Amino acid sequence: FPVLGLDSRGVGGLMNSFPPPQGHAQNPLQVGAELQSRFFASQGCAQSPFQAAPAPPPTPQAPAAEPLQVDLLPVLAAAQESAAAAAAAAAAAAAVVTAPPAPAAASTVDTAALKQPPAPPPPPPAVSAPAAEAAPPAAAATIAAAAATAVVAPTSTVAVAPVASVLEKKTKSKGPYICALCAKEFKNGYNLRRHEAIHTGAKAGRVPSGAMKMPTMVPLSLLSVPQLSGASGGGGEAGAGGGTTAVAAGGVVTTTASGKRIRKNHACEMCGKAFRDVYHLNRHKLSHSDEKPYQCPVCQQRFKRKDRMSYHVRSHDGAVHKPYNCSHCGK
């Protein structure tokens, strides 16, 4: 405040020295602003130092000047120089393409040697069969014919090539199965047996249609008959579920008329007849006994098998259809 020239009374005394204007309400803010402006006006200031100075108006910028033609002369000169260099390069490339070829060097090939006829090829080596294996008659004849052809025409390359291929085909082994009559080889035994049937005139693995089929029987000497105990029912009765008997030497194999092989491992210890399962064996054992465990509930007739008894019971109530009648008695 001493800078502004205030005395010891301070700001309060300064404000009292300037009476507020009359004619309007006493607004503290408005009165303070008026007093402040009157004070700075008396001190010779245009405005209050606490107020920000107004920003100066923007200075208008002058428009950019266009380049003169003198400034563009270096650019035009550089463009002309690049066009001249491109034309010179194109002319040099055209001169290289249209240049005549260089004269060829003198040939050092002996043309007289080329006019001479070619020398005959050397004769092929003699083909000999290995001593360890005996060649079949057909293969031996083929080898002899090939050797004769090689001796007669040693310079014929066209005739030697087919003979070599024939020898390669004939000497190639197909398998270890060889026919004893014609020495033909096969890959497996099945094909060999079919081939041997051609020599004998019989079909392999087939039974003649007129041949009589006999039931498969097993000698009793091959059977192992167990000792029957009293706990098993005794008497060899099959109705109580008798056991099975294994056939010695791996069982019996039967071949049907269609060529199907059936293995029968269960044999009857009384007659030696063989069966393929236990069911048919037990049903067969009923024929050796006199026991008839199944009885008809209507007429008390007894049967060995249950299916026979069931069929008989149906005949009592007329459930069994009998379409066949006797021509003599009508039954």
Swiss-Prot record:
GO BP term, pick one: positive regulation of transcription by RNA polymerase II
Expressing tissues: Ubiquitously expressed.
Q: Where in the cell is it found?
A: Nucleus
Q: Which PROSITE patterns match?
A: ZINC_FINGER_C2H2_1 (PS00028), ZINC_FINGER_C2H2_2 (PS50157)
Entry GO terms, CC: nucleus
Q: Which regions are flagged for Pro residues bias?
A: 117-127
Q: Which GO terms describe its molecular function?
A: DNA binding; DNA-binding transcription factor activity, RNA polymerase II-specific; zinc ion binding
- Pfam family name, one: zf-C2H2
Q: Which InterPro entries match?
A: Znf_C2H2_sf (IPR036236), Znf_C2H2_type (IPR013087)
Please name the SMART domains in this protein's record. ZnF_C2H2
Q: C2H2-type zinc finger positions in the chain? A: 177-199, 266-288, 294-316, 324-331
Which UniProt key words apply to this protein? Activator, DNA-binding, Metal-binding, Nucleus, Repeat, Transcription, Transcription regulation, Zinc, Zinc-finger
What are the boundaries of the region Disordered? 46-65, 108-131
Protein role: Transcriptional regulator. Acts as a transcriptional activator that binds to purine-rich GAGA sites found in the promoter of many genes including insulin I and II and islet amyloid polypeptide.
How does the record describe its quaternary structure?
Answer: Interacts with BPTF.
Instruction: Please state what the protein is called.
Output: Myc-associated zinc finger protein
Query: Which organism was this protein described from?
Result: Mesocricetus auratus (Golden hamster)
- Taxonomic placement: Eukaryota, Metazoa, Chordata, Craniata, Vertebrata
